[in-house]
Curated annotation (Swiss-Prot):
GO terms for cellular component: extracellular region; host cell presynaptic membrane. Insecticidal toxin. This toxin promotes opening of insect Nav channels. The toxin binds to the S1-S2 and S3-S4 loops in the domain II voltage-sensor of insect Nav channels (i.e., receptor site 4). The American cockroach P.americana is largely resistant to the effects of this toxin due to an unusual sequence within the domain II S1-S2 loop. In vivo, paralyzes lepidopteran and dipteran larvae. Paralyzed insects ultimately die from secondary effects of starvation and dehydration. This is Beta-diguetoxin-Dc1a. It comes from the Eukaryota. Expressed by the venom gland. Keywords: Disulfide bond, Ion channel impairing toxin, Knottin, Neurotoxin, Presynaptic neurotoxin, Secreted, Signal, Toxin, Voltage-gated sodium channel impairing toxin. Belongs to the neurotoxin 26 (DTX) family.
Length: 94
């Protein structure tokens, strides 16, 4: 009987720890509810005519931030190899 009580207590402690971890991860992944109401997917912050996520760019042309997948993401121009001698630069999250 004592073993059963100990196992029950350990399993309850594990469930509680998992719930705390999931709550913490949810807070990290999502911005505050006020930000979610104001921003919509695709909204950007930056100078007029700045490039959005996954658009070809040169250095300094990307928007500062774009709201994607429920979070503000800072953007930067990243160059990816598209061939042996060539590369393609696109705006990606930092």
């Amino acid at each position: 009987m004592k073993v059963f009580v100990v196992l029950l207590c350990l399993s309850l402690a594990a469930v509680y720890a998992l719930e705390e971890r999931l709550d913490k991860d949810a807070d990290i992944m999502l911005d505050s509810p006020a930000d979610m109401e104001r921003a919509k997917d695709g909204d950007v912050e930056g100078p007029a005519g700045c490039k959005k996520y996954d658009v070809e760019c040169d250095s300094g042309e990307c928007c500062q931030k774009q709201y994607l997948w429920y979070k503000w993401r800072p953007l930067d121009c990243r160059c990816l190899k598209s061939g042996f001698f060539s590369s393609k630069c696109v705006c990606r999250d930092v």
